[in-house]
């Protein structure tokens, strides 16, 4: 009887450890694929040069074309504004008032984006 209880206990412990390990691996991989972002009012708490995601609405009349593929614009969370500098092709849904997530680094009070993601609502239809 003692051996039977010990074997059952070992089996239960192995099952719990396996389940914990499996859930940990799944959560670790999901964290890499989920797009978390900070609003402009929270980015001052982040150190300069650290890669982060900033999200907000493109402010009206803030889009300035600097060169052929360089653009500057301001995003806001209605508390604070953040100037974004971006070089590259803009997403098709990019426009004033649109929700944007910028991925890049904070440098001298400006956010240098290496990638832009345009947010859309549940009624998304690709541009024609």
From Swiss-Prot:
The chain crosses the membrane at residues 9-29. GO terms for molecular function: heme binding; metal ion binding. It comes from the Bacteria. InterPro entries: CcmE (IPR004329), CcmE-like_sf (IPR036127), NA-bd_OB-fold (IPR012340). Heme binds at residues 120, 124. GO terms for cellular component: plasma membrane. It is a single-pass type II membrane protein. Residues 30-128 are periplasmic. Residues 1-8 are cytoplasmic. Keywords: Cell inner membrane, Cell membrane, Cytochrome c-type biogenesis, Heme, Iron, Membrane, Metal-binding, Signal-anchor, Transmembrane, Transmembrane helix. Its main location: membrane. It is found in: Cell inner membrane. GO terms for biological process: cytochrome complex assembly. Signal peptide: none annotated. Heme chaperone required for the biogenesis of c-type cytochromes. Transiently binds heme delivered by CcmC and transfers the heme to apo-cytochromes in a process facilitated by CcmF and CcmH. Belongs to the CcmE/CycJ family. This is Cytochrome c-type biogenesis protein CcmE. It comes from Rickettsia rickettsii (strain Sheila Smith).
